[in-house]
A protein has these predicted regions:
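Conserved acetyl-CoA-binding loop-helix of GNAT-fold acetyltransferases
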Residues: 100-113, 117, 136-140
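Hydrophobic pocket/interface hotspot
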Residues: 19
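Conserved GNAT acetyl-CoA-binding A-motif
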Residues: 115-126
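Terminal substrate-recognition subdomain of acyl/acetyltransferases
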Residues: 2, 159-171
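Short glycine/proline-centered loop/turn elements that form peptide/ligand docking sites
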Residues: 108, 131-134, 151-156
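Acetyl-CoA-dependent GNAT
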Residues: 10-13, 24-27, 37-97, 108-109, ...
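Conserved catalytic-core motifs of GNAT/GCN5-like acyltransferases
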Residues: 124-127, 139, 144-160
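Conserved G/P- and acidic residue-centered "switch" motifs that form tight phosphate/ATP-binding loops
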Residues: 69, 102, 131
């Protein structure tokens, strides 16, 4: 899926090093994520193995937004197990310099297309209650707030509330 400035592609094992580096960058840009500038603490081989499995999966997917081969954003769906297998967790991130360019919408549309093709019934996500830009994006695609989870994060001694949101694909 190509756009004027960026393309949306499914993550592959060869994206692992660039993806780990990307996660360090975005972790240092905001406090909206579950990690900081340390990124996710995975070895390169573990990330490659994870992406290799995910690239063939119909239960999980990770898309990348790229500009000239550089990762500027990512979005993923991860299916729950057993009694919750009709539900998937949705996550999305974008380098701050690319906020507002349409990449988050393009990633979300790719995710929704994958979800519908694979008969997922519910998408769930967690978002900082004060991240109005992200909340607006989710609401644009039909996500609804279920509740607020007080003190979901604790950063530098400050409690951060999160909203739990859901999109039903059955309606």
């Amino acid at each position: 899926m190509k756009h004027t400035m960026f393309e949306i592609v499914r993550a592959q094992a060869e994206d692992a090093a660039a993806l780990l580096n990307y996660l360090k960058i975005i972790g240092g840009e905001t406090d909206n994520l579950s990690f900081g500038p340390e990124g996710v603490l995975l070895a390169l081989e573990a990330e490659q193995s994870y992406l290799r499995l995910q690239a063939q999966s119909t239960d999980n997917v990770q898309y990348l937004a790229k500009v000239n081969g550089e990762i500027i954003g990512t979005a993923s769906l991860n299916r729950k197990n057993n009694r919750m297998c009709h539900r998937v967790e949705f996550g999305i991130s974008l380098k701050k310099a690319w906020w507002g360019c349409g990449a988050a919408s393009a990633l979300t549309e790719a995710i929704l297309s994958f979800a519908k093709e694979n008969d997922f019934r519910q998408l769930n996500l967690e978002v900082r209650s004060d991240n109005f830009r992200a909340i607006h994006l989710y609401e644009k695609y039909g996500f609804r707030k279920l509740c607020t989870f007080p003190a979901f994060f604790r950063i530098n001694g400050q409690d951060i509330d999160f909203d739990l949101m859901n999109l039903s694909l059955e309606e």
